[in-house]
Amino acid sequence: MILELDCGNSFIKWRVIHVADAVIEGGGIVDSDQALVAEVAALASVRLTGCRIVSVRSEEETDALCALIAQAFAVQAKVAHPVREMAGVRNGYDDYQRLGMDRWLAALGAFHLAKGACLVIDLGTAAKADFVSADGEHLGGYICPGMPLMRSQLRTHTRRIRYDDASAERALSSLSPGRSTVEAVERGCVLMLQGFAYTQLEQARVLWGEEFTVFLTGGDAPLVRAALPQARVVPDLVFVGLAMACPLD
């Protein structure tokens, strides 16, 4: 079995899959390396034969995680690294090594699934969009604050905005104008995300008309799902690209 890790800015997304058929044995989201080891170790009758990682962390942090995995599970982790071209997709950055690996692998996965032009909208700590043409050219993309960052900035820099996570969840029962601060903030942030997504869709239409596929991924993808009914929601899109970048037998 293979352990796959997507190490983001705030959390680690993980899953364990069978090598032969990619059936998922277990998975989750954790906020620390130690919590990751504990959750994977808790899976009954799982014996890891490999590990592959995509990380936007520093090299030192990623190396420390690899060492911890080697110690805990006796497997060597394979880390995805930037390349100029892979699987028919050409990296669109002037300095290809500067493109975030999460964005690069999501683009690889999307192009593989779409078999043509595609728009990837990834809504996590940051909101990201990337465009890949029908011939595999990565045309670039956009990054802006995601829901967690928008919410955090308002809570941190506005003294009278204080509420808990349960209140935030209840506030999203609709998107009508808020009648409390929590409703106004949460619904306003969702509308910002939806506006970001709509704008990317219009950019794609200018480029390709209607001949493209939209992919939604990331933890907050459900917040814009209803606004983009034509989109394919692929929660593990980065893992699709990771399997291509780091093949394991």
From Swiss-Prot:
Full protein name: Type III pantothenate kinase
Q: Which reaction does it catalyse?
A: (R)-pantothenate + ATP = (R)-4'-phosphopantothenate + ADP + H(+)
Q: Where does K(+) bind?
A: 122
**Cofactors per UniProt?**
NH4(+); K(+)
Q: Does the keyword Nucleotide-binding apply?
A: yes
Entry's Gene Ontology BP terms: coenzyme A biosynthetic process
InterPro entries documented for this protein? ATPase_NBD, Type_III_PanK
Q: Which residues bind substrate?
A: 93, 100-103, 181
Annotated keywords: ATP-binding, Coenzyme A biosynthesis, Cytoplasm, Kinase, Metal-binding, Nucleotide-binding, Potassium, Transferase
Q: What is its EC number?
A: 2.7.1.33
Give the HAMAP family listed for this entry: Pantothen_kinase_3 (MF_01274)
Localization per record: Cytoplasm
| GO-annotated cellular components | cytoplasm
Q: How is the cofactor bound?
A: A monovalent cation. Ammonium or potassium.
Residues in the active site? 102
Regarding protein family, the annotation reads:
Belongs to the type III pantothenate kinase family.
Function (record text): Catalyzes the phosphorylation of pantothenate (Pan), the first step in CoA biosynthesis.
